[in-house]
Regions:
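Short loop/beta submotifs within extracellular cysteine-rich repeat domains
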Residues: 91-95, 101-104, 155-160, 168-170, ...
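Juxtamembrane segments of multi-pass membrane proteins
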Residues: 260-368
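Conserved small/polar residues in nucleotide/adenosyl-binding loops
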Residues: 404-413
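Short, structured motif recognition centered on aromatic/hydrophobic residues
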Residues: 11, 82-88, 96, 148-150, ...
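Hydrophobic alpha-helical segments
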Residues: 137-219
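Internal alpha-helical transmembrane segments
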Residues: 1-42, 195, 199-283
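Juxtamembrane extramembrane loops of integral membrane proteins
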Residues: 32-110
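Membrane-proximal low-complexity regions enriched in glycine and acidic/polar residues
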Residues: 80-84, 90-145, 320-382
Length: 414
């Protein structure tokens, strides 16, 4: 008991501030989420593509980019010319013009300034080149680094972030978002830039802090119950053997301790990242199986010869599914053309990719689905869920717009 009391007391002294921060910052996050660029805003910031000027075939570009290394391919307009954007496993990005195959030069301040002036009607206050800052520290931005941060002289004090590789808008924040997120997500996730830019270190720090928090709370609940039983045995009707603040700490701990433990455990599990449980992220082998081969091999079959003309076409994305390239067209505000994903086609591709498992169920993920909301965030509307009969009771989630293999969770833990 003395050892447990010592641990609870001093872990509480060290972690008490973190508990308070996690709770209060979590309340802020309920109302102000971390800044994220909306898809329609991203598309609006792009320029129209001159599809007639696309003269370099995709197989030529893919060969030049590296057929075995490329993981994604799309077309946008850069400098009023169509350009291929190649993504790699290493999170690198390469841009080449689609009219002659030459590399797109890195963007400079002048080109970014001209683009902002053309796409916004707001005056510019400042432009600077940044490698990392608080709102672009996530690893999903690595391919676009360094970025140009453009500060607008508007009432919202808007900051725009543009890739130095492609010139695309990749992030947008306002003064209100930044203020509340310093009190919310930055505190809640222990997200200072100097720590978060080292993902593995940040992940380890948060995981162990949460584990020690669980230990502190569990010991506290146990000690609280033990003291409660002792005093009830000695004095009928008494709730606590302590006085003053210790008494209130004991009584409140008895009622709220289990809630605190479940709260800390749930946060700790969200940071597991494969330590104790499987992750829902598909492996490269699983992605390749759904694609019907490597992305480079499948997408090299793409042809733009019959590509319809759209006056406001902003982006062409190429995906791979079941050995066939899939072309998805997006306009200024929305996806305007995508092939229809037939149930029989899904079943055939999944059966081929997972020959040792049978398909038990095929369904459309409903809005507000429990496991989707807790484990994977929000999936696109109309996402298909395929349930397999393997030992892990695997589910596959496939986006019906892009045919992208989104997640692959096994037995659910909520």
């Amino acid at each position: 008991m003395k050892v447990l009391t010592f641990l609870h007391r001093w872990l509480g002294v060290v972690l008490g501030l973190f508990f308070a921060m996690w709770f209060l910052s979590g309340m802020v996050m309920m109302y102000v989420p971390f800044p994220s660029l909306q898809e329609n805003v991203r598309l609006t910031s792009l320029s129209d593509i001159d599809t007639k000027a696309i003269t370099i075939p995709t197989d030529t570009v893919i060969t030049a980019c590296g057929k075995n290394e490329i993981t994604a391919l799309r077309v946008i307009s850069i400098d009023a010319r169509p350009a291929y954007i190649c993504n790699y496993k290493s999170r690198k990005v390469k841009a080449v013009y689609a009219d002659n195959g030459s590399p797109v030069p890195p963007r400079d301040q002048l080109s970014i300034r001209q683009h902002v002036e053309q796409t916004t009607n707001k005056p510019l206050k400042f432009i600077t080149l940044v490698e990392y800052d608080q709102w672009t520290v996530h690893q999903k931005f690595d391919a676009q680094r360094p970025m140009y941060r453009v500060e607008l002289a508007d009432s919202d004090e808007t900051h725009l972030y543009f890739s130095s590789i492609t010139g695309e808008l990749v992030q947008l924040t306002t003064d209100t978002q930044r203020f509340w997120n310093y009190l919310g997500a930055v505190v809640h996730w222990i997200y200072p830039t100097i720590l978060r830019k080292h993902w593995a270190l940040w992940d380890t720090v948060v995981w162990w802090l949460s584990l020690f928090g669980i230990l502190c709370a569990v010991i506290g609940v146990y000690l609280g119950v033990v003291h409660f039983k002792k005093i009830r045995h000695l004095r009928q009707g008494a709730l606590s053997p302590f006085r003053g603040w210790m008494k209130w700490h004991h009584i409140l701990g008895l009622f709220a301790g289990f809630i605190v433990v479940s709260w800390i455990v749930s946060g700790w599990l969200s940071m597991d990242h494969g330590r104790l449980f499987s992750t829902p992220n598909p492996t490269m082998e699983q992605v390749k199986a759904i694609q019907g081969g490597s992305f480079g091999e499948v997408s090299s079959k793409t042809s733009f010869e019959d590509l319809p003309e759209y006056p406001t076409l902003r982006e062409i994305k190429i995906h791979a599914f079941g050995g066939e390239p899939i072309i998805v067209l997006s306009s200024k505000h929305e996806t305007i053309k995508t092939p229809v994903l037939e149930p029989n086609r899904v079943s055939a591709v999944v059966s081929s990719a997972f020959p040792k498992a049978n398909i038990e169920k095929w369904s459309i993920v409903p809005p507000g689905d429990t496991y989707t909301a807790l484990r994977e965030g929000t999936l696109p509307p109309g996402t298909i869920r395929v349930e397999l009969s393997d030992k892990g009771e695997t589910w596959l989630h496939i986006d019906t717009v892009s045919y992208t293999h989104l997640t692959l969770p096994t037995k659910r833990i909520v």
